[in-house]
Amino acid sequence: MSLAKIVHRSEKSFKVEIEVSYKKSMLEGEEAIQEAINQAGCLMTGEMLCQFDTDGSPIMIGGVKWTSKGLISKTYQTPYGEAEIERHIYQSPKGGAGFCPLERDARIILTATPKFAKILASKYAEFGSSRVNDDLEGNHGRKV
C-alpha cells in the first residue's frame, strides 16, 4: 500500500502527500509514521536523484562521443530504504564499461546515496557490522 505520493511537480520543487492510519497504541502509531516517512523518503530521494540524470543526448568524454544505451533501472540505498529509478547509461563506440553521469554528479558511492554512506561510515566507526544492521533496523526501520 502506497503511503506517500508526489502530488505536484514544478521546475524548482515537488510536493509529497503522506497518509497514515490511526493505530490502537502509540507504539504502533509511531511505527506506522516511521514506515510512511521512510516510504516518502525513498520516493523523494528517487525524485532528487533523477535531477542529476541526463536527457539521453550524446556526451563527450575525452574527445570521444558516448551514446546512451537508454534508461536502465537501478536500486539505490538511501537512509529511508531502497529507491529504484531509471537512469541513462552511456557507452563509448569501442564498447566496454558503461558510464552513468547521474552517479558521478549525485556523488553515489557504489549504490549508496551520500547521506546513507555518511550514516554507515559513522556507525561502522562506532560499532561492528552486526550491530550496525541491528541499529538501522531497530532505530530507523531500515533493513540492510
Regions found by a protein language model. Give the residues of each.
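Short, conserved DNA-binding cores of transcription-related domains
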Residues: M1-P93
